[in-house]
């Protein structure tokens, strides 16, 4: 988790079908620790004001290295992938209205600033990968604590350091579809998973980006709902006292209710700590 400031994994055989998320009950929720310093403060109304173009008003700060990816992973559990493609450090920690107790993980937003002379006015796209639970993130209806890279990307050419020096910005933002350019959804079987318990971190969903529900099915079985564990991790337990049987098929339901079914997503012989990348994904629009 995070407080605003101013300022691989081994991929098992590529599956022809998606995988299914299930998550570890006992894993602690990761925290991103940040120092908080500002030169000025401002407040916004409790309800974001929307413009005619569909933009809403909010606030932004940044954290971590000026040219980095914020925290090393964040409260969604994406770990070092936040600095790698396709995220490429263009990420943000969301205040409560954006992080949504982890249900907002993976959602994409365009953000632009216009109230500072260093602002370019051009929108940048970020993915929610972390939580910002205090400070301005609580005081504002919508607040993005952005990576130094993403914050600086809102600046005019050669003005990134000047914009980061401002520390706090009024911004405009809107939700947009995620587009990972042909990448399939990946599923990382979490540490602690065993024959009776399966936990999976799910990422790189096109379109809505977030997930509202996940179901898993054993061979010849029925769809069983999985529980949201934390961040982008979902979990399932054996309800029969017998080991769970792979391969597992997975049914994903996005935040907007779009369903994607992946047959035989996680293979027999799966191992905790391994990532299985499918070759399918939601449409990006």
Identify the meaning behind each predicted range.
Residues 2-285:
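Folded extracytoplasmic luminal domains of secretory or organellar precursors
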